[in-house]
Amino acid sequence: MFKRILVAVDGSKTSLKALDKAIDLQKLIPEVEIYIICVYKHHSLFEASLSIGRPADMDIPDKVLSEYAKEVVNHAKELAKEHGATKVRGFVKAGKPSRVIVKFAQDKEADLIVVGTKGTNSDKDGMFLGSVSHRVASNAKCPVLVV
């Protein structure tokens, strides 16, 4: 059935609900590996120059975002282990979240992707699905569980 489950987290409540579902599945199928990924949007030098302006600080946005993503993944791994998950690995990637999640799932041969309905940047009163979860569900080659 499932060997690898990829869970996309961003620190939002819905991404932690997605993690809970992956943990529940691992309890039913103990040999399942849970891969936790947090993707931060990489900023080009041009984008960085618009917001900061000093050449020496051009890489600060990526450093800050990368560190935040690492914290999110580490927190998610700790939560997973506290809730009984055994085989858990964490990954941090830069890029467009939906594309990176779909490609990473293909590269790691994930059998299932679990995402929250809306992430940290979603409009609370907007559509039923956030743009990342919608794009992942539309483009993934494996099943996607939206929580």
Regions from the PLM with identified roles:
Residues 115-138:
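Glycine-rich, Arg-bearing micro-motifs that act as flexible, cationic patches
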Residues 1-56:
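Small/aliphatic-rich secondary-structure junction motif
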Residues 56-70:
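A short acidic, glycine-rich active-site loop
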Residues 51-55, 106-108, 131-132:
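Short, hinge-like loop/turn segments at secondary-structure boundaries
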Residues 75-113:
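Structural beta-alpha unit
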Residues 143-147:
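Short hydrophobic/aromatic patches at helix-to-coil boundaries
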